[in-house]
From Swiss-Prot:
Post-translational modification as stated in the protein's UniProt record: Contains 2 disulfide bonds.
Classification lineage: Eukaryota, Metazoa, Ecdysozoa, Arthropoda, Myriapoda
One GO cellular component term: extracellular region
Keywords: Disulfide bond, Neurotoxin, Secreted, Signal, Toxin
Chief localization: secreted
Expressing tissues: Expressed by the venom gland.
The name this protein goes by in its record: Putative neurotoxin 1
Keyword Secreted included in the entry's annotation: yes
Amino acid sequence: MKAFIVILSIAIVLLLIVSIKETSAKDCKQECVKRYTKGDLTNFLKAEYEPKNRGGICYCEFTCHVKFYIYLKHEMD
C-alpha cells in the first residue's frame, strides 16, 4: 500500500512538471508574437523554451531572420 502511494505521488509530481512546461512553452510563443509582430503570426517561425529557476529563457525566431531571447518570470504561489 505504501509503495502504491509513493508511485502515485511521483506520478502526480511529474504530471505537474509536464503541464507547467507546456504552459510555459505556450507563453513563450505568445510573448514572441506579441513583442515583435503585435499578434500577427505571418512571419513567426519558432519559439523554444528552456526552463530555469522561477522562469525561463524563451528563444524567438521569425522568417525574416529576426532572432531574440526573452526572459520569462513565473510567479511562485
